[in-house]
């Protein structure tokens, strides 16, 4: 579930994208509320109407003005139950990652799919790359996490957290030399970061043996 910002423009944009939107209305008064859930399934700007699936009514048509008043009395709460491959058109990247992270706690496979589709939409967002790499790593899909961090660093070569996580992923696939090179790249970017210094010492405790097929790591200039 993804909560929308409460505006008619956002609401109509989602509906125009064939995404039904669950809304809360107050059909009563502020001092005597009558809470009601409905699903917005259509609108007509020429006729100034909104079509709701409300209770047992599949197509309840009301004026936009009336709908907006009852919606406003419920603080314009709205949400969509989006599938991983159908990101809300009005979604904010960082907020979307936070929502998917909550899903990840119970449904890690669905979260991975959601992160992958989010990267297709926001390839320049480092947080999404980190989230995908971390999700794969936590599921012990170490080679997948290596590939994810490597690809992410093409877009964000100066992101020390990506380098740090890339180093740990490389270490998990027995690429010790590449792992140490990657953590040195992270430290070069932020030499006084105590967490990176800890990672540097930690990774140097492992055997530096190298598997047959390992990444060749080059720090950004």
Question: What are these language model-derived features?
Answer:
Residues 118, 151-152, 185-186:
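Canonical positions in the second alpha-helix
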Residues 93, 126-127, 160-161, 194-195:
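Helix-start (N-cap) detector for alpha-helical repeat units in TPR-like alpha-solenoids
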Residues 44-130:
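Noncatalytic regulatory segments and standalone regulatory/sensor domains
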Residues 4-53:
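Active-site-adjacent substructure of cysteine-protease-like catalytic cores
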